Each structure stands twice: as C-alpha cells, then as structure tokens.
C-alpha cells in the first residue's frame, strides 16, 4: 500500500457499478447489514463472483478496504487500539478528514470476522459476534451453532433473513 499513495490497486477488480446493477436495492440492504454488524453469509459459485461481491460491498465504506488487518482473526483489535483521536481538521488532507470523521470504521476488528472465501477449517471462527463470509459449501448453511442472520444466494439473487434483525 505504501508504494501506491491512493491505494488504488486494492480496488482493482471491485466493480461497484456491476454490483449495484445486478443487486439493485439489495446492495443498500447489504451495506446496511454490514454497518449493523450482522452475520452475513454469501453462498454460491463461482468463487470469483463470491469474493467480488463482498469486496465491492466493503469498498463502499470509506477507508475500510486498506485497513482490514484485523479481519482474519476475531481476537485481533489493532485498528481500535492504535486509533488516535483527531485534534484538528485539515480539509485539504484526506487522511486528516477521515480521522476526524472516525474512519475507518472498526467493523472487522474485535469479535468480528471477514473472509471472502471461508474454508471448512475456519468454521470455528463463526462463533464471533459478527462476520461476513463467502462459501461454496452447504455445510455452512446448515451449521446449528453459528447460524447467519442473512444468507445471500448468488444463484437466486436473493437475501434470506434467518434471524430477527433489530
């Protein structure tokens, strides 16, 4: 990231236009579910579409994509721990503006998990409070100990709400 001053290479392959065109109003629903820190499972084939949808959604939240260092393990919390409160605001400096607004949001830090393609070996990580995962394995859909709040089905292009969202 340091060699690319804007971090544009992180956003390569994420097509927000395609995401909004394909998922329409459901794009906003998914974004709200991520912001509310719900348990979201994206299910379907191919894996490329699975990951592209998730990265496109995460890229809609300002400054989150370059700050996913805690996303792979629920016990990590470096983003929240290393955060410093902005003392001044410089409108000409993007980093200053983001820090003043409290961004990036710590959505995937402590007790949260983000894995665009989650293998069966990481099923224990789904015991945390919030997660966004992608899978092609039906075992995840029928897991009793850590059921998702929402299943996003790539085949049917629909959201299935399994739990009450409040």
Each predicted region: which residue ranges?
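Acidic, Ser/Thr/Pro/Gly-enriched alpha-helical scaffold modules and adjacent low-complexity linkers
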Residues: 1-166
